[in-house]
Amino acid sequence: FDCCNGTREKVEPVDENMPIYDALAKKYLNINCSVMSPNNSRMQYIDEMIDEYQVDGVIEIILQACHTYNIESHYVKQTVTNKGKSYLMIETDYSQADKGQIHTRLEAFLETLEK
C-alpha cells in the first residue's frame, strides 16, 4: 500500500496557485521516498496508516535493486514494532524463483498474527 506508485504520491496535491514548474518540483521533492534522506515523513505516514487501518502487522516488500528502501527497512521495522505490531520484510526481484519461499514466509507470518 505504501510504495513508490501507491498512496504516498497522492497525499499532497500539486499547488495550483504556484507557477506550474515550481509546483511540480515542490510536489515531487516532498514525496517521502527513501532516496530523500532523512525520510522521517515516511515513518510518520506509516505510523498514521497503522492507526487509521488498525493493522495487526506490516509486510514490507522490497525490490532487490532498490538499495535505499533496503537500508530504510530498519527504520520501518522500528516504527512498526514500536507500535507493538508484527513486521515482515520480503526482498524479491519479482521473479518466480522465490515464489515458494515467499509463500512459506507469508503463511508463517499470518500464523503469528492469529495467535
Regions found by a protein language model. Name each.
Residues 74-115:
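Peripheral docking tails and interdomain loops at the edges
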Residues 27-28, 49, 105, 112:
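Residues that form generic nucleotide/phosphate-binding pockets
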Residues 7-11, 43-44, 65-69, 96-98:
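Flexible loop/turn segments at secondary-structure boundaries
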Residues 37-54, 71-72:
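A short, acidic, amphipathic alpha-helical segment used as a generic capping/interface helix at domain edges
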